[in-house]
Amino acid sequence: MKTIIAAYSGVLRGTGSSLLSAVHDLPSIPWLSKSSVVRHLQIISVLQWVLSFLILGVACTAVLVYIFCTDLWLIAALYFTWMVLDWNTPYKGGRRSSWVRNWAVWRYFRDYFPVKLVKTHNLLPSRNYIFGYHPHGIMCLGAFCNFGTEATGVSKKFPGIKCHLATLAGNFRMPVLREYLMSGGICPVNRDTINYILSKNGTGNAVVIAVGGAAESLNCRPGKNTVTLLHRKGFVKVALQHGADLVPIYSFGENETYKQVVFEEGSWGRWIQQKFQKYVGFAPCLFHGCSFFSSNSWGLVPYANPITTVVGEPITVPKIEQPTQKDVELYHSMYLSSLHRLFDKYKTKLGLPDSETLEFI
């Protein structure tokens, strides 16, 4: 067990040598075989992110409030002061760390599923982009791995392009979690932040938006390819205002990572979810994956199903500071058609039957 802990500490530090040497020194016990240790490191890498996303912010808030009531109150006071002074940083592009984005832990995260990033066209560093990510899934695991880390080599595949994965603004009001998210280049998904990145941050920026949002997450389930997009047009308007090209992305396998109880429209369960989404900002989902010890037991570890994220052809968008509804409708329809073609082109290559269709709601 000490050997496993030592190995994982090397993963968190982003070093590979300590991990490899530790694994080679393992005794010849079946559950301590090299492949078993690597698999457990992959599970731990995924689980730490899931738990960070779900409870890190709340847990750190509670800890800091507790510390504030002890003799160590100065530590909490200094951090909260720092938060106040640094409050607007997430809304101005954040504070990314190449070191964090290249941690070895993300490569183990990638290999757990595994996650793959497919490039179909070159992107020009002289342009800005809005990436539309579909489907949302429960936690956008493919989006995080591909665009919030360097595990799949996004910066090498698209040289000169800096990706900004957008997520709920409320996450950046949580102590420690905000620092963790910003280190990966993650930013709040609100109009002010997107406007700043696309207008005051030079060129070569790509804002990655899970367009379907919380509403789409309520409908995701394995084997279903449905995206909430027909009435989502705000991202198209922003793209027109800044002349940012639109890039459709479909992540095959994103909906296969968790199973959830889907409440039908009009049911009491869906009513509660929608009210929660309206007033809190996100929708609570009743979902489960597998446990740490067995894929046959329920838990928070996502199912190890492949996620292949295909980045489509950019749609050239002109800059129109005051776009009309007709302008928005035109480029929205172009985006729908492009996403549909992308899905149809790759579905059979990635294991779906030719009869499978992409549904827009």
UniProtKB/Swiss-Prot annotation:
Disulphide-bonded residues: none
Membrane topology is: Multi-pass membrane protein
Q: Which UniProt keywords apply?
A: Acyltransferase, Cytoplasm, Endoplasmic reticulum, Glycerol metabolism, Lipid biosynthesis, Lipid droplet, Lipid metabolism, Membrane, Transferase, Transmembrane, Transmembrane helix
Main subcellular localization, coarse class? endoplasmic reticulum
Source organism, top-level taxon: Eukaryota
- UniProt entry tagged with the keyword Cytoplasm: yes
InterPro entries assigned = DAGAT
List GO terms (cellular component aspect). endoplasmic reticulum membrane; lipid droplet; perinuclear endoplasmic reticulum membrane
Q: In which pathway does it act?
A: Glycerolipid metabolism; triacylglycerol biosynthesis
Q: Which reaction does it catalyse?
A: an acyl-CoA + a 1,2-diacyl-sn-glycerol = a triacyl-sn-glycerol + CoA; all-trans-retinol + an acyl-CoA = an all-trans-retinyl ester + CoA; 2-(9Z-octadecenoyl)-glycerol + (9Z)-octadecenoyl-CoA = 1,2-di-(9Z-octadecenoyl)-sn-glycerol + CoA; 1,2-di-(9Z-octadecenoyl)-sn-glycerol + (9Z)-octadecenoyl-CoA = 1,2,3-tri-(9Z-octadecenoyl)-glycerol + CoA
A Pfam family that this protein carries is DAGAT
**One term of GO molecular function:** retinol O-fatty-acyltransferase activity
The EC number(s) this enzyme carries: 2.3.1.20, 2.3.1.76
For this chain, the family text in UniProt reads:
Belongs to the diacylglycerol acyltransferase family.
Tell me, in a sentence or two, what this protein's role is: Essential acyltransferase that catalyzes the terminal and only committed step in triacylglycerol synthesis by using diacylglycerol and fatty acyl CoA as substrates. Required for synthesis and storage of intracellular triglycerides. Probably plays a central role in cytosolic lipid accumulation.
| Record-given protein name | Diacylglycerol O-acyltransferase 2
